[in-house]
Each structure stands twice: as C-alpha cells, then as structure tokens.
Amino acid sequence: MPRSIRPFITRRSVLAGSLVSAVALALTACGSKGSADGSVKGIEVKDGVATITIGATPQPHVTILQWVQDNLAAGAGLSLDIKEIDDYQTPNTSLDDGSLAANFYQTPNFLKQQIEEKGYDFVSIADVHIEPMGIYTSKGYTSVDQAANGGTVVLNSDPANTARGLKLLQTAGLITLDPSVEIPSDLDVTANPKNLKLVTVDGAQVAASMADAELAVINGNYALQAGLVPSRDALVLEPGEHSPYANELVVRTADKGNEHLVKLAGLMNSPELKAYIEQTWTDGSVIPAF
C-alpha cells in the first residue's frame, strides 16, 4: 500500500518534438478564430451556441472535458472543441497566441513557473481535480527503501514538476531538500544517502523510462496513460486532501470575465461533474478539487 536531479540524460524526445510541432501547427491552423464579435480568440458564437476551443492532455483531462461536452455543455449554450495535446508546453503557447480560449492540464505551481519564465498573462478560473503524483518501480519492490544504492530515479523534466517530484522523494525519506527554496532543483538536494542519480526526461516519457531505472516519479495523468493504478501500484503516493496541486481551468486574464468561460467554469465545478469523477475513478487516482 502507498505511504501517506541531476546528471541530466539526453532527452528521449525527438519524436515527441515532432509531435509537438505538428500539434502546434494544427492548433494554429484551426483554432485561432475569435468569437463572432471578435471579443475572445478561441470562442465562436453561432446560432446561440458558443464553441470554446480548449486544449488538454489526454488522461483524465480530455475524458473529463468530453463528459462535460456530452452531458452538460448544451444546457449551458456551450460546445467544446477539445484539442488533445501530449506535451506540457503547447497548451500554454497555444493559449497565449489565441489558438485556444482555455486549457485544462496544469497545477498552480506549474502555472506560476510558466508565468514567471514565459511572461504569460493567464489566470485560473476553476480548480477541477487532483491527480496524486506517485513513486513507481518495475523492479518488484514493495518499498522505496529497496532501491539500490547509486540507482537511477527518473523525474519529469519541467521545473515545477521536477520540484514536486523532489518533494515527494523527500517525503519518502530518500533525499533532503533545502527548506528555504520554494521550487527546488537537484542543486537544492542537501542529503542523498543512497547516492541516487536523479535524471529528468520529458513528462510523457517518465513511465516508459521506468524499466531502465530503480524508481520513477510519475504524474497522475501519465500513470493512468501507462495503465498504472496509483492506489495499487505506487510505492509512495501524494495525499489528495489539502493538495496544492489541483488541475486548473486556465484562461487569458483579459478573458476571465467572458460569459461563456464563466459558464464553463461553473460546469467544471458542478455537482454533476463531482459525482462523475468520484464514480469513475473509484481507485482515488483522480479526486475532485471542489
């Protein structure tokens, strides 16, 4: 049961890079229309229905959005044009350039880091759900304490998720971090008793890299995509209660008061969606954040 960096390697992301480029081009080509009156890029109003172009990572984000589209959107005069995106950068670049009206995939720490690094003018308008990050292994271990000295631990490479993963490793007792650093990197590891090699790869590649490592720290959505059951398979799992890592519905700050986006935020925090999440992910891998 679950308990509740970096000699960097060359990223295994040539294919992923090509995919990112292709998705970005597709979004630019088909998603940059404004609304009928030109007020919000990524929203088109026709015959009383506002079509919102929204980008999301596959699991569980696209699944949640598709349920909202199929069950709630029409009643609010909305239609969701859902763009499935497999990386952590394109949803924000596409929101920034107007290809999307909103995105749904990121946590507050990641959003803060992106705003600071890229200068985005974004804001969250709804906390939707939590996907606990976990420490996994393919070695058959039942405890992180079984990890070999000098072994490799794979983490998500974007700074916010690297920091989140490092904090989970600290919770597991594998490393100690400088407590004065809010978003730590490998440079802030002050103790590493097992001399673990902390390696980062693209988030979508962490689960695939698990076979070559002692441990892998995997985001909840990528664990689901890899067929893992967090409550069963994780050696250590983040607690869901009072988590600072809610997945958010994010829009451009200038658009936060748009009536159609406000309606969408309401649907994303509706009792109906809460019940759907609780009934669908009964293993606790996805937890409502509202």
Question: How does the language model describe each region?
Answer:
Residues 125-175, 274:
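A conserved helix-loop-strand patch within extracytoplasmic ligand-binding domains
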Residues 26-29:
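C-terminal motif of bacterial Sec signal peptides marking the signal peptidase cleavage site
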Residues 132-144, 245-258:
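A bilobed periplasmic-binding-protein/Venus flytrap-type ligand-binding module shared by bacterial periplasmic
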